[in-house]
Regions:
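Mature, structured domains of secreted/extracytosolic soluble proteins
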Residues: 1-651
Length: 651
């Protein structure tokens, strides 16, 4: 500890850092663990002998010391707590929300026989853990925590070229479609340079007052990937050949024979997004690194407690896969027995229902997501591999089922950079906001285009009591001009796009929405929306006035409540969703019962599954003190919102 500097720019040591104020978690390897690590280095001929005297040069010695020390320490800073065992991620394969000093996420696994915990495969001592010190916790481990620096691309290429069993066929297919170079990426070095040299300027303060800081710019722009990979056992079962005898042609023939991707091309241009194999393989990848506790986010849905951390009502996420853009649905509930891919259960979603699963047909049960592969060489720096035991595909049945449901997504979930750079799902600290550069300064987001003088902030209300779906929100100060590339719709048809807004603030603004296919020439959608208007009031800096949009509190008469909902829809409004609390966890009042939380219907147009659509928000008030608020969007097909037999649910 006392021989490893805190950073390249500092002469202070990690030992000095751990003697100071703060909140630190240390996974300290015992002497036998360090010796075993030196033995491994000697076997790999990295050092001459398995001792500290076996290093031939100081550079290698310093590097190994840094690996051992940096990977052992999580610095939670001044505002967030250190981790005792009770605060470890509860999911098997879950990650600590804070990275270690090597900027790597550590993964926890739990075992029953005997009861034990590992940190990146390092067994934690059964007695010498949870050692409380003034500024944190120490947990003794029986091996050095040392994640590999390899990438997912390197791993899959190695499996393919060296014919390693387990994921040989899947890695062969990834190689065939030309994804390996993309999967090598882990950091945007151009952004590193821009950040370190001040090319990306500091943000303004989001609000004035004690404790409010400037928008914190991300230090890095990391890439990440999640791969749901069929095991070799699956392919042997489906193809009927030994895993090492299976060829790309075998898989393509099998896809055609089984009716997968019937509109795709069947030529040998596997790098093309129009190709059948390309569409099959890329659907297995998400452009973000998601540990098991981040596939479906839980925070303020009905009945959920972060103390018990047990799923309650049906909760879901919709992500866009890599390659040809298509939706992948992830669902977790009290009844689902973990996270499932493309699960479509029957839900108790009546007005007086529970929003729990009633049942699920076998052909709609989806794919159970198991514990990820995190041991040894699989613990790569830019990705996670989940082994799946059945074929994963974007079938016509999946598209049909997606087209029969309302698709709600937190706007931040459509921005992979939020997850890849530890911005989303972090604990709230007073006054802290993340800020992002204008696109002209640096394009931090692939799917968000930030105009000059649009000060774009992310407010992480996770573990707070804000009235936001999943706790967080995005907002903009200054002269608003933001364009989003939207996720795809699952099938051709007429859709509504709804925009959820919490209209409690007096400083909200008026916004013109634009929507269409040509990002640089989007037509306006209707008249500007005054997002200061709630269900009951219109709040302005000059006073509060009735909104007269038809909002009324629910009564015991559901027929009357349905009429109120129709009246609101006629005015372009909907009540908030019943699924989440009107604030933090454990509240008996849901968002639907709060008149300041409303959904605005901003688009009702035909949309095609193979088109890319954009949504632009532009302020119509010449007042840079106004604030634009964003929480979540909904796609709702006409078959749902205009269904006379089964009206859209309130959830």
């Amino acid at each position: 500890l006392n021989k490893v500097p805190v950073s390249r720019m500092s002469s202070s040591t990690v030992g000095s850092l751990l003697s100071a104020r703060g909140h630190f978690t240390v996974f300290a390897p015992d002497n036998d663990a360090v010796q075993a690590y030196l033995d491994t280095l000697a076997m790999k001929n990295i050092i001459a002998s398995a001792s500290w005297d076996g290093f031939s040069d100081s550079t290698t010695l310093d590097s190994i010391r840094k690996v051992i020390v940096y990977n052992s320490v999580i610095n939670s800073g001044d505002n967030l707590p250190a981790y005792d065992v009770a605060q470890f991620p509860i999911n098997d394969g879950g990650e600590f929300s804070k990275s270690n000093m090597y900027d790597r996420k550590l993964i926890v696994n739990y075992f029953d026989d005997p009861d034990s915990i590992t940190i990146n495969g390092a067994l934690m001592d059964a007695r010498n853990n949870n050692i409380r010190v003034l500024n944190g916790y120490v947990h003794c481990v029986h091996s050095v925590v040392a994640p590999t620096n390899n990438t997912l691309g390197y791993l899959l290429n190695k499996i393919y070229t060296e014919k390693e069993s387990g994921y040989y066929v899947s890695s062969m297919l990834v190689h065939a479609v030309g994804m390996l170079d993309t999967l090598q990426r882990y950091r945007d070095d151009e952004y590193e340079q821009a950040y370190q040299t001040g090319q990306v300027p500091e943000m303004i303060a989001h609000e004035s007052g004690v404790g409010y800081t400037t928008g914190k710019l991300p230090e890095h722009r990391y890439y990440g990937f999640t791969f749901f990979a069929e095991t070799d056992d699956v392919w042997e079962r489906e193809i009927g050949k030994n895993r090492f005898d299976i060829t790309v042609d075998d898989v393509v023939s099998w896809l055609k024979e089984n009716g997968y991707y019937p509109t795709a091309k069947t030529d040998e241009n596997y790098h093309s997004e129009d190709n059948i194999l390309n569409q099959f393989v890329t659907y297995h990848f998400l452009p973000m690194r998601l540990a098991s506790d981040r596939l479906v986010l839980h925070w303020n849905e009905k009945g959920y407690s972060s103390q018990r951390k047990q799923p309650t009502v049906v909760q879901y996420e919709y992500y866009t896969c890599m390659g040809k853009r298509r939706l992948v649905k992830f669902l977790e509930s009290a009844e689902s027995d973990g996270v499932c891919i493309n699960r479509f259960p029957k839900i108790d979603n009546s007005r007086r229902g529970s929003y729990h699963e009633i049942s699920c047909d076998a052909d709609k049960a989806g794919i159970k997501v198991p514990i990820p592969e995190t041991e040894g060489e699989f613990n790569v720096r830019n990705g996670i591999v989940y082994p799946i035991d059945q074929i994963m595909a974007y079938t016509e049945d999946v598209q049909h089922n997606l087209h029969k449901e309302r698709i709600r997504f937190d706007i931040a979930s459509a921005m992979p950079e939020m997850m890849n750079n530890d911005i989303r799902l972090q604990y709230y600290s007073l006054g802290q906001r993340w800020g992002f550069p204008f696109t002209s300064q640096y394009p931090y987001f692939d799917d968000v285009f930030i105009g000059d003088e649009s000060w774009f902030f992310y407010y992480n209300g996770y573990n707070e009591t804000m009235k936001n779906y999943q706790g967080d929100e995005l907002n903009v100060r200054g002269f608003l001009d933001i364009t989003f590339r939207l996720p795809p719709v699952p099938a051709d048809g007429i859709y509504e796009i709804r925009f959820n807004v919490q209209s409690e603030g007096h400083n909200r603004g008026m916004v013109q929405f634009y929507w269409g296919e040509n990002k640089d020439n989007l037509p306006p959608m209707g008249i500007p929306l005054d997002i200061r208007t709630s269900g009951l009031e219109r709040r302005t800096t000059s006073g509060t006035f009735p909104s007269n949009v038809g909002w009324e509190r629910d009564t015991q008469d559901d027929d009357y409540n349905a009429e109120v909902d129709k009246k609101l829809r006629n005015n372009g409004f909907m009540k908030g969703a019943e699924i989440y609390c009107d604030g933090g966890q454990g509240l008996s009042t849901m968002a639907r019962a709060d008149p300041v939380i409303v959904r605005r219907i901003i688009v009702r147009e035909p949309m095609k599954a193979d088109e890319t659509y954009y949504l632009r928000f532009k302020s119509v008030l010449d007042d840079q003190t106004r604030e634009f608020y964003m929480d979540y969007l909904e796609y709702c097909p006409k078959e749902v919102y205009d269904n006379p037999e089964t009206p859209e649910d309130i959830w």
